[in-house]
Amino acid sequence: MNPFPRAEISSSALQTNLAALRQQAPASRVMAVVKANGYGHGLLNVANCLVSADGFGLARLDEALELRAGGVTARLLLLEGFFRATDLPLLVGHDIDTVVHHSSQLEMLEQTVLSKPVTVWLKVDSGMHRLGFTPEQFSTVYDRLMACSNVAKPIHLMTHFACADEPDNTYTSVQMAAFNTLTAGLPGFRTLANSAGALYWPQSQGDWIRPGIALYGVSPVTGDCGANHGLVPAMELVSQLIAVRDHKANQPVGYGCFWTAKQDTRLGVVAIGYGDGYPRNAPEGTPVWVNGRRVPIVGRVSMDMLTVDLGQDAQDKVGDSALLWGKALPVEEVAEHIGTIAYELVTKLTPRVAVCLA
């Protein structure tokens, strides 16, 4: 077996997760969010596995064009919209929807000559204060879009939650109320719910939900696990032991002699490091799954390798598999040890890691 790390992507897990989310929001269509290379799972891999999704959400135009070139015919939505007037003919030519969240985009729509109108999702800033038009701006912007011949009718409406991943935080209710009041009586689709909205705020589900991380089997909520919602990890990040060595008590290991053994033990060296996207700041004790058990990282993660304490009586050998995260070792647990979020772990894998459908 190739000793280098690989991300094995389960098509059945992706399909299971889509079905679970449909069950959570039976009245809603699903806009599967596949930005950032399908959250590190491979853009076309994910889209081809999720052919039954009603649409796909993306961050960048090149992602949408890659899906169209790959034969994807479903609705595509640019969640950050377009950035240049020259993008607009590409949206028209490839039948790509766009979010409009800024006055510069509105002006480009008004000033560009297009062969047919573009489908627009007008983004309301209901309280996240990142992208979108404020309630005070909304009516004027909506009227201008309605008057613009380059905009298909009806105009669809959306917002994004700041704190939906905190189920006890009432700010999500405040945002929902603001959005619903502002858009009451208007035609078009409505979409509010991201993964956390779909799982924890059913009243936010609307016409479309926009799940991202949950599609990949991961909970959006710190301290929670996707399995609690019927989700299955879609990624198994796997490498192997490239060395197993006896190690004496009171001897250090790794750069900076950061860790010293308290007793005689056996160490395993795993072929993965920060050059592959595994975080350098993973602290001592971060778990790795080897031969049916958790073993702790010891010493510093280096560019190509990390070291684990296999234990004094370990029988592990060179070539044995090491799971960095996956079904047996949830990525949420690893992220909590490292002090980050699962989103960051799965999206930061570098091109050295082979991504393959398993």
From Swiss-Prot:
Catalytic site: 35 (proton acceptor), 255 (proton acceptor)
Taxonomy, superkingdom: Bacteria
Modified residues (N6-(pyridoxal phosphate)lysine): 35
Keyword set includes Isomerase: yes
EC number(s) from the headed UniProt entry: 5.1.1.1
Gene Ontology annotations for the cellular component aspect, listed alphabetically: cytosol
Cofactor(s), by name: pyridoxal 5'-phosphate
GO-annotated biological processes: D-alanine biosynthetic process
Pfam family, one: Ala_racemase_N
Family stated for the protein in its record: Belongs to the alanine racemase family.
Function of the protein: Catalyzes the interconversion of L-alanine and D-alanine. May also act on other amino acids.
Protein name in UniProt: Alanine racemase
Gene source species: Shewanella baltica (strain OS195)
